[in-house]
Amino acid sequence: MGQKVNPIGLRLGINRTWDSRWFAGRDYASLLHQDLAIKKYLKSKLAQAGVSRIVIERPAKKARITIHTARPGVVIGKKGQDIENLRKKLQVMTGNEVHLNIVEIRKPELDAQLVAENIAQQLERRVAFRRAMKRAVQSAMRLGALGIRINCGGRLGGAEIARTEWYREGRVPLHTLRADVDYGTAAAHTTYGVCGVKVWVFKGEIMEHDPMAQDKRSQDQGR
């Protein structure tokens, strides 16, 4: 089962918590659509900032949005101008007071989502897929990952028949629930069609039962 299921969804409530944290009654559907619109807007607006995760919390009449990014300077802008414009736009979208928090990702090579997006960008620039995958694996292992697996699928190298290629180094225990396995996906839109990229990064085991462990760890790394 661990082979097939999304590793993050499998570990929710164990060592990972939800990216949208709020309670709603009848307006649940509209708030969910609002969350999706916010994430889509921020991903497109901050495409150059290396955004990995967007966490949305909704205390009473407010929205607290935490952006996990590899380049906080791009998000904040000169004298904080960009982040202020962003906050105003999000306040219009939500109709509530918005607080923006920026969490820096110190080691983007260990963030599965950023690794997947980086490989997808390389595939779009016609970099050889094997070279892109090997380079990502080596970088992650050098910076302290205990294991990494990368899958690329599609018309790789412009081949007539689509196939899936993968690389793995170290160990990636998909069944072990206490394992801190990060997972990310991206799509490369090439001239031959769309290639999918999946990345699993194993960072160690979290012994205590703490759903917020992932958030705390990323904040500790950001200090």
Swiss-Prot record:
Domain of life assignment: Bacteria
GO cellular-component term (any): cytosolic small ribosomal subunit
Keyword field contains Metal-binding: no
Keyword ATP-binding: no
Alphabetical keyword list: Ribonucleoprotein, Ribosomal protein, RNA-binding, rRNA-binding
Alphabetized Gene3D superfamilies for the sequence: 3.30.300.20, Ribosomal protein S3, C-terminal domain
One GO BP: translation
Record InterPro entries: KH_dom, KH_dom-like_a/b, KH_dom_type_2, KH_sf_prok-type, Ribosomal_S3_C_sf, Ribosomal_uS3_bac-typ, Ribosomal_uS3_C, Ribosomal_uS3_CS
Domain KH type-2: 38-106
GO molecular function, one term: rRNA binding
HAMAP family, alphabetized: Ribosomal_uS3_B (MF_01309_B)
Subunit comment: Part of the 30S ribosomal subunit. Forms a tight complex with proteins S10 and S14.
Function statement: Binds the lower part of the 30S subunit head. Binds mRNA in the 70S ribosome, positioning it for translation.
Family, per entry: Belongs to the universal ribosomal protein uS3 family.
Protein name (record): Small ribosomal subunit protein uS3
Organism, scientific name: Rhodospirillum rubrum (strain ATCC 11170 / ATH 1.1.1 / DSM 467 / LMG 4362 / NCIMB 8255 / S1)
